[in-house]
């Protein structure tokens, strides 16, 4: 029944060779955890003039995003471990990003509930040291 509904004859669906193989996603082929297909869709939707996006471009952007995420999470995990807690909070992310010079220049965003870095101005420290020195002399 070639023209009606039902099983089709031929094509890739009916071949015996493809029955044993399982499909691998672009992420699995590239050895990534982040979804390459979703990143490619976002790239296609957010480009102007509906430009074409190559598969390798999506894989590359996905790899960069995964690397940066792993880097930030590792540093935030170390910050949480130093404070002897088991949960990463926005404060730990803030400490991790602002503690690394390269990440600080890359991520200039304000992190909600991140707080501020502890820092005392040198001019204020000099005044405190001078007061202590004057008290010891007197």
Curated annotation (Swiss-Prot):
Modified residue annotations for N6-acetyllysine: 5, 12
Changes after translation: Acetylated once deposited into chromatin.
Compositionally biased spans, kind Gly residues: 1-13
A GO term, aspect molecular function: chromatin DNA binding
CDD domains for this protein: HFD_H2A
Example of a GO cellular component annotation carried by this entry: nucleus
Cellular localisation: Nucleus; Chromosome
Protein name, UniProt field: Histone H2A.Z
Lineage of origin: Eukaryota, Fungi, Dikarya, Ascomycota, Pezizomycotina
Gene from which this protein is expressed: HTZ1
């Amino acid at each position: 029944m070639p023209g009606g509904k039902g099983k089709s004859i031929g094509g890739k669906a009916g071949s015996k060779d493809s029955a044993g193989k399982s499909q691998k996603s672009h992420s699995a082929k590239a050895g990534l955890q982040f979804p390459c297909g979703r990143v490619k869709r976002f790239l296609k939707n957010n480009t102007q003039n509906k430009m074409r996006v190559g598969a390798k471009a999506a894989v590359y952007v996905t790899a960069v995003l995964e690397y940066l995420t792993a880097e930030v999470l590792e540093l935030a995990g170390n910050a949480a471990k130093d404070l002897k807690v088991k949960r990463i909070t926005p404060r730990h992310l803030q400490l991790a990003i602002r503690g690394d010079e390269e990440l600080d220049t890359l991520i200039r965003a304000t992190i909600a509930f991140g707080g501020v870095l502890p820092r005392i101005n040198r001019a204020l420290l000099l005044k405190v040291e001078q007061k202590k020195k004057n008290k010891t002399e007197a």
